[in-house]
């Protein structure tokens, strides 16, 4: 990696971009929003998987009651921010139309981190898989978590 390969920009939060990287990304519902309904979680999981293998490689994802975590690698010339924008925009419009939610649905910003090595990649995938158990320890099966079978960065 050279300095010219790494792009850093800032909105309210800093964002680092490095071509070919895997990112761990988190975004949340806006503060005025009630928890996601089961149908909304289904829609969001479907949206996350929709362009998998075309615009991005999705390694893991979980839709919680008020936030989302994904482990994702943009493909080709797809910018990470465009991928996240498409997920948030598509689901916000769908949630407004189908569930009567009023905007804003999602917080404007999101947290992203470049995954630096294979161990961190595996740790983040495990975090995604275990995230529902942190909130609901008695849970045996959570339908809104997904981890790719061939989990290699």
PLM features per residue range, with description:
Residues 1-153:
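Short catalytic/metal-binding and nucleic-acid-binding patches
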């Amino acid at each position: 990696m050279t300095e010219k390969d790494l792009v850093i920009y800032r909105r309210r939060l800093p964002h680092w971009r490095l071509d070919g990287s895997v990112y761990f990304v988190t975004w949340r519902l806006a503060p005025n929003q009630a928890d996601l309904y089961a149908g909304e979680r289904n829609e969001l999981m479907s949206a996350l998987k929709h362009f998998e293998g075309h615009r991005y490689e999705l390694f893991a994802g979980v839709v919680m009651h008020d936030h989302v975590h994904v482990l994702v690698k943009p493909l080709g010339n797809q910018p990470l921010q465009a991928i996240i924008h498409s997920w948030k925009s598509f689901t916000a419009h769908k949630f407004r139309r189908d569930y009567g939610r009023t905007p804003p649905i999602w917080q404007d910003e999101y947290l992203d981190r470049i995954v630096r090595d294979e161990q961190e990649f595996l740790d983040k995938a495990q975090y995604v898989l275990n995230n529902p158990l942190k909130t609901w320890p008695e849970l045996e099966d959570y339908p809104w978590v997904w981890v790719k079978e061939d989990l290699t960065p």
